[in-house]
């Protein structure tokens, strides 16, 4: 996809009167029956955050302006028989009890812009892209608790009921001083090998992405860690381990202080807005 390169990064700044999104809380613009479900056990996922996508990072068109992120963290939970096949493959419901009735209602009313993803350890995530009109409506009501399987138990208790907390609102603050803005992140850029031994480096020698703690950054005093530990769109990545392969420059990076997702206790995650892939690692 031929996209215009962003010229700014955008960092999250919490504010009581923030207008660019919120962590925790409930989503807006979806019905209780549209609340994303785990493909492992059918339980409604936790809402992690909703964020406005800056125009420079909006790869989906002008009608879609917000991204709501949900997590189930169900990688160690017991599988509810038939749920994955029902939701992912269109198979038949296995029962007519309250749990399956709620699951049928969800499948028949799924939000048209819901995207389901599985992370590297098998945990489920959902992204819902929302319009300004949808987000400007009232916050969503929780699904009925009839939607829980009989004898439901979770290893991590990350679902819409256990994680129903007051919202924390925020603004997005633009910055144009990140040298990596608009550049695809790479862990080992080829161009750096040819110049890293040069003592008299100049800013004009920069030919591509520079990892956050690379010695070239120190030689040129680029201050790439200026926004370290900030949730942000684009620019210099701050992964807990290495930069994910094939991560585009159109990404959002966050850690567990944004809505309390389960990403290893000290993890950092990246959502690639071009591919809808989520990556995360912990230290």
Regions found by a protein language model. Give the residues of each.
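Preference for intrinsically disordered or flexible, low-complexity segments
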Residues: 1-283
């Amino acid at each position: 996809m031929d996209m215009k390169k962003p010229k700014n990064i955008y960092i999250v700044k919490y504010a009581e009167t923030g207008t660019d999104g919120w962590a925790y809380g409930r989503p807006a613009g979806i019905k209780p029956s549209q609340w994303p479900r785990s493909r492992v056990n059918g339980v409604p996922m936790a809402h992690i955050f909703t964020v406005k996508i800056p125009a420079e990072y909006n790869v989906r068109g002008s009608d879609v302006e917000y991204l709501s992120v949900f997590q189930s963290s169900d990688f160690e939970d017991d599988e509810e028989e038939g749920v994955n096949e029902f939701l992912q493959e269109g198979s038949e419901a296995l029962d007519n009890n309250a749990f399956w009735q709620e699951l049928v209602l969800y499948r028949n009313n799924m939000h048209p812009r819901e995207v389901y993803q599985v992370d590297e350890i098998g945990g489920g995530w959902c992204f819902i892209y929302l319009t300004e009109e949808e987000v400007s409506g009232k916050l969503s009501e929780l699904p009925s608790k009839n939607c829980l399987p009989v004898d439901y138990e979770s290893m991590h208790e990350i679902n819409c009921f256990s994680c129903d907390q007051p919202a924390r609102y925020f603004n997005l603050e633009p910055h144009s001083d990140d040298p990596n803005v608009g550049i695809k992140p790479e862990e080992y850029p080829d161009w750096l090998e040819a110049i890293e031994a040069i003592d008299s480096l100049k800013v004009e020698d920069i030919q591509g992405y520079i990892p956050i703690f690379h010695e070239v950054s120190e030689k040129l005093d680029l201050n790439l860690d200026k926004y370290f530990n900030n949730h942000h769109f684009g620019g210099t990545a701050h992964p807990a381990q290495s930069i994910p392969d094939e991560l585009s420059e159109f990404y959002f990076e966050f850690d567990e202080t944004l809505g309390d997702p389960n990403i290893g206790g000290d993890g950092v995650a990246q959502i690639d807005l071009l591919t809808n892939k989520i990556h995360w690692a912990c230290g």
